[in-house]
Amino acid sequence: MQDSNTPIIGMIVPPAPRRVPADGGRLYPGLPFIATGLGRGSVTPEGYDAVIESVVDHACRLKEEGAAVISLMGTSLSFYRGAAFNRALTAAMHDATGLPCTTMSTAVLNGLRALDVARVALATAYIDDVNDRLAAFLAEEGLVPAGCRSLGITGVDAMGRVDTDTLVDLCVRAIEAAPDSDAILLSCGGLQTLDAIPEVERRLGVPVVSSSPAGFWDAVRLAGSGAKAATGYGRLLGA
């Protein structure tokens, strides 16, 4: 039974439907999550521009619905204008709601830092323009992006249809391109990565920080609930 004192975690998700990403129920089955959807049309800078100004309004909606903390669960949506913008967006959400707020870009940074990663191989769903912006964001934050392999997807629905074997192969190619990396960043919150993470870590011997699992891990930590993630989904979630 859910403790009535357990903080509700609010999530702003890029797709239109107000659905909590499936990773939440697998990783933290006892925690309460709620969501509101931005209705982003494409995984491109133009798609981000169309919805970014509504993020703060969605944060306020989640507060009205009882959220105690809020996460913007979009990686590229929060890094595409750079590190300073990610911080400013987080501050704007906090100022409007008075609640602790975070973003998925902050989550992956926190995950990489928790694992003492300095040099990171990039495995992404994105087109080249977005990959370049991700590399620049990581460099601004003091990390060394090392190589990149990507799927070149722009469709929101297509992200969720990428299968586990494709994700594992993508990560293998990323580490082959940058074999001296400390970890792999598997970037895009729309990818279903939970089953790929343990296989990649077993095969390659390096940790994987993936957008959506890291987003849940970070939001739960911010909420201060003390809940632990379900086991078997990689080093970060087992830390």
Regions found by a protein language model. Name each.
Residues 59-106:
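Glycine/small-residue-rich loop that forms an oxyanion/phosphate-binding "nest" at active or ligand-binding sites
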Residues 153-158, 204, 208-228:
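Short, flexible loop segments at boundaries between secondary-structure elements
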Residues 52-65, 169-181:
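Short, well-structured alpha-helical segments in soluble
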Residues 169-200, 216:
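Hydrophobic alpha-helical
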Residues 93-156, 237-239:
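Conserved beta-alpha
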Residues 1-57, 129-131, 135-163:
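N-terminal glycine-rich anion-binding loop in soluble enzyme alpha/beta folds
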Residues 68-73, 121-122, 181-188:
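Periplasmic-binding protein-like
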Residues 71-72, 101-105, 147, 186, ...:
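General beta-strand structural signal in soluble alpha/beta enzymes
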